[in-house]
Design a protein with these regions (language model features):
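Eukaryotic scaffold repeat domains enriched in small/polar residues
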Residues: 1-136
Length: 136
């Protein structure tokens, strides 16, 4: 019997064989997000390929590296298709094009906020807000 995760209208069947990686690659995915073109972006804790992109069937399309991350934490793709990444340990949020060009960095590397929010990386929803389900 397949493993089902999620609740309500948002349930998914787990497929351990879905991602078709290039030979010899490891992909310790920290966060996954799908875009409007049915591509799946995986933000990984690998020093060699931070962002790996697949089609909806799990076929590898391409990848890009996103600088120097210490702890990949979250990915979000906004309504314009821009890719937002959070590194939990360095306390920064980054905005990239879908092709991997850095557009914006929020926060100072290795400096945690003293505003009462424990980490800038606590939630990507604090950074990017859009109307829609299921999260905002």
């Amino acid at each position: 019997m397949p493993k089902i995760v999620g609740t309500g209208n948002y349930t998914y069947e787990v497929n351990e064989e879905w991602a078709q990686l290039p030979e010899g690659w490891d992909m310790p995915a920290a966060s996954v997000f799908g875009d409007s073109q049915d591509r799946v972006f995986c933000f990984n804790r690998s020093p060699d390929h931070h962002i790996v992109i697949f089609d909806r069937e799990g076929n590898y399309l391409h990848h890009w590296d996103a600088g120097s991350f210490t702890f990949a934490h979250a990915i979000f793709i906004d309504h314009e298709g821009m890719v937002w990444l959070i590194d939990r340990d360095i306390g920064q949020v980054f905005k990239y094009t879908p092709e991997g060009q850095l557009l914006l960095t929020i926060g100072t590397r290795d400096y945690q906020s003293d505003t009462g929010i424990a980490e800038i990386s606590s939630s990507l929803a604090h950074t990017v807000v859009r109307p829609g389900e299921p999260f905002n």
